[in-house]
Amino acid sequence: MANPKADRLIQFLTEQGITSPQVLAAIHALPREFFVAPAMMHQAYDNNALPIGQGQTISQPYIVAKMTELLALTPETKVLEIGTGSGYQTAVLAKLVNHVFTVERIKTLQWDAKRRLKQLDIYNVSTKHGDGWQGWPARGPFDAILVTAAAAKVPQSLLDQLAEGGRMVIPVGEDEQYLYKIVRQGGQFISERVEAVRFVPLVAGDLA
């Protein structure tokens, strides 16, 4: 089914330097309007972050594409997402790997995301209501960890759950935030600063 708005979004992402055909195809295939409030549907394919309630947002499509591309995913990659939010980033990951593990601290957001994923026939996702700072150690280690909220510093518990050779993409900072790619190599963590970003804060604890 033709979607001119999705076509234009993919063209924009390509112009912004996103090159992975798999990432672009996953974003093109997903109806972003399904993950936003009805009042925001007319902006669903704009390159903007949009509110989803509970003080949280759905990230702008460029950031979703960039973070996903940085993880260099293959179908076998074992992925942990911190911050399920609307479920949009989760759905993009689920199009690219065999299984996604995702943690959300706000119960109502977790429920809504699970409902959306089910309605889109996306079943290769395990969701957990819990503290994102703690990750999901019982299911680790992970080849890739994607964090969708900004931490003042990288949580050690998440570094501990990264497999050898694994990649983490995480926004770090408070007033000034930067996206980092962290690779675990031989017991060390190699950190690369990618670009300036703006995310909601990664809050410890969970909410009913």
UniProtKB/Swiss-Prot annotation:
EC number(s) on file: 2.1.1.77
Top-level taxon of origin: Bacteria
Residue positions of the active site: S59
Catalytic activity: [protein]-L-isoaspartate + S-adenosyl-L-methionine = [protein]-L-isoaspartate alpha-methyl ester + S-adenosyl-L-homocysteine
Annotated Gene3D superfamilies: Vaccinia Virus protein VP39
InterPro entries reported in the protein's UniProt record: PCMT, SAM-dependent_MTases_sf
Keyword field: Cytoplasm, Methyltransferase, S-adenosyl-L-methionine, Transferase
Pfam families (alphabetical): PCMT
UniProt keyword annotation of 4Fe-4S present: no
Transmembrane stretches, start-end: none
Gene Ontology CC terms, in alphabetical order: cytoplasm
Protein role: Catalyzes the methyl esterification of L-isoaspartyl residues in peptides and proteins that result from spontaneous decomposition of normal L-aspartyl and L-asparaginyl residues. It plays a role in the repair and/or degradation of damaged proteins.
Family assignment from sequence similarity: Belongs to the methyltransferase superfamily. L-isoaspartyl/D-aspartyl protein methyltransferase family.
Protein name as it appears in the record: Protein-L-isoaspartate O-methyltransferase
Gene designation per UniProt: pcm
